[in-house]
């Protein structure tokens, strides 16, 4: 236990304002929802995740995998083989969370063309840049 003024103080569990707050605590991070999405397919090796999630750096991917593991939603499986073989799987908790993201994936699929157009207009694609 941590000490405050030489007295042991019990750690305080985080308080969440609502269920969404608790969910966001787990999935906040640019790549975490994509990691969960790709792990829904089953055991996945690091290299497969790296190829599937474009533009993520090794440092950030490793950090976010560790954070998701600490949150109890994924498991790192080290097979203790030579050459080394490691993969990642969702825990039961992670399965339920990743499945909850599926409606968001469907929304993105249904609205992808509209979103591409809006972002292109916003970012000035297709216009001459001054």
Each model region followed by its residue ranges:
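Beta-hairpin "wing" of winged helix-turn-helix
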Residues: 69-89
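C-terminal regulatory/oligomerization modules of transcriptional regulators
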Residues: 1-17, 70, 75, 92-130
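N-terminal helix-turn-helix DNA-binding core of bacterial DNA-binding proteins
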Residues: 14-60, 66, 80, 87, ...
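Proline-rich low-complexity regions
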Residues: 54, 83-84, 99, 103
């Amino acid at each position: 236990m941590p000490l405050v003024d030489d007295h042991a103080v019990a750690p305080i569990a985080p308080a969440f304002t609502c269920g969404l707050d608790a969910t966001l605590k787990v999935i906040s991070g640019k790549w975490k929802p994509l990691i969960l999405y790709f792990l829904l397919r089953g055991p996945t090796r690091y290299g497969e995740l790296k190829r599937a999630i474009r533009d993520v750096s090794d440092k950030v991917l490793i950090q976010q995998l560790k954070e998701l593991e600490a949150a109890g939603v994924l498991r790192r499986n080290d097979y203790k083989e030579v050459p080394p073989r490691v993969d990642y799987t969702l825990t039961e908790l992670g399965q339920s969370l990743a499945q909850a993201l599926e409606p968001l994936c469907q929304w993105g699929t249904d609205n992808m063309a509209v979103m591409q157009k809006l972002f292109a207009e916003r970012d000035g694609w297709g216009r001459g840049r001054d």
